[in-house]
Amino acid sequence: MKHLHRFFSSDASGGIILIIAAVLAMIMANSGATSGWYHDFLETPVQLRVGTLEINKNMLLWINDALMAVFFLLVGLEVKRELMQGSLASLRQAAFPVIAAIGGMIVPALLYLAFNYADPITREGWAIPAATDIAFALGVLALLGSRVPLALKIFLMALAIIDDLGAIIIIALFYTNDLSMASLGVAAVAIAVLVVLNLCGVRRTGVYILVGVVLWTAVLKSGVHATLAGVIVGFFIPLKEKHGRSPAKRLEHVLHPWVAYLILPLFAFANAGVSLQGVTLEGLTSILPLGIIAGLLIGKPLGISLFCWLALRLKLAHLPEGTTYQQIMAVGILCGIGFTMSIFIASLAFGSVDPELINWAKLGILVGSISSAVIGYSWLRVRLRPSV
């Protein structure tokens, strides 16, 4: 029990469980004995009916639309905390990770488009390599233990949070279906209620969650991706402490183990089951997977390193204390671990087009993410001396 407690207390535990879930999905999707069960599980219909309201989706969509909204609620809480009290609270603190994140989104997207611009269908996946899996990246960094400078961990977390915020904006602007104005109206009313609750100093988290459920349902029915409701709710839950208690921090503390050990692993299990049947080297080097691999493995570190170098040269920002530019470059490689976030965007980009495209996109994401994890970890292991 002591070893189990130590495992779940470590920063690396969430990343390790994600890896196990993804590997299990790959095995089950490619085994004759389990592939049928795996796909049947994902296609299991689940219906929710409240009065005249009816939501009917399969298990995969419930995981992607409902459970991932909880993940984005946690992201919203983390972004708010960092903006108001943490590593993004001042312009001087925020400048370096913000500039790094911008480079880490622009260059991978451009590199992907260099491969896919001529194809109007695969071109829609331009945002896939722009994402970073914060849990996976921090998990890999945690494997290096105490030799990692605290400032480097904070830099990676801040960069990944800004990256997540960028991904949220991209999803809202570019990956929406036909809009229902009536549902958007209900969503607007729900947001107005959240504003009033916050301004009136309401500190009961349950009230915000209840309004959040209404908001999630309205956003789901509107055509905008429902997970955005989670971020919005997270932004309005009060962060300020009163009598030593902060509703936002308390909810963040409660949600973190559920997200790290259930929601993200379940998402990985549901989405990483890529069938390798018919996969050839020729297929793997086709424009879609190759663009994703290049974006994650080359575009991410190149964009982050280049923009950081420019920021330093132009004196727009400074290196985090106790870190080196080579360590920043290695962190840039770790940010090429797109995994769950990239898979999520791929499902939005190609979900209504062709399941085969999603399969090839997932394969590119897995190759690019695993390569980034191995190379980034190896580089940092060489660059960082064990603490004595």
Curated annotation (Swiss-Prot):
Compartment(s) where it occurs, according to its Swiss-Prot or TrEMBL record: Cell inner membrane
Alphabetical list of Pfam families matching this protein: Na_H_antiport_1
Keywords linked to the UniProt accession: Antiport, Cell inner membrane, Cell membrane, Ion transport, Membrane, Sodium, Sodium transport, Transmembrane, Transmembrane helix, Transport
A single GO BP: regulation of pH
Cytoplasmic side: 1-11, 81-96, 131-154, 201-204, 237-253, 311-339, 381-388
PANTHER family given in the database record: NA(+)_H(+) ANTIPORTER NHAA, SODIUM ION/PROTON ANTIPORTER NHAA-RELATED
Protein name: Na(+)/H(+) antiporter NhaA
